[in-house]
Amino acid sequence: MKSKRLVMFWVVMVVTIILDQMIKAWVRGHLNVGQSWSGGPWHGIFEITLTYNKGIAFGMLQGGGLIMTPIAVIIAGYAIFTIYRNRGESTWATIALGLLASGAIGNLIDRVFNGKDGVTDMFLLRLANITHGKMNDFPVFNIADSCISVAMVMLLISWSKNPVSDKVDPKLAPEPVIEDPAV
């Protein structure tokens, strides 16, 4: 069972990194910055638009993306460490950790190899604002961003269903200290 979870973690992580990088490469090869493509039943609601994000998620902290490089390494390292340390975790948590690592690594690849351009973003959702009767643009995002967002929701749900126990594993508990009354 433990090895199945490890395989699942690595498959989720590797497949989503490859998917993220392939879509980013396709968009960079077929669209110019700011150019959009939209079609089918989602026309006007969902667009593929090439943008570069030099900040963090959803375009915040523009120019502050450099700090995300070490943070991405820490996040990916945390996910990998956790999956090896807690191999008995649920399937849900295993998938979430794979998505978390892949999202961090996917955007890290962009930061390292795109350098000055930043992270490639491409998915644009236009959401209806019923108060003002117009469409509002949701910040442009990519597969890696989606992986991180979905992973965080999954982990929060997993943690709420299985809160961290205060019980100490008997194998890890320290030996009791017996005081010598003669001392």
Describe the predicted segments one by one.
Residues 1-183:
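Alpha-helical transmembrane bundles and membrane-interface segments of multipass inner-membrane proteins
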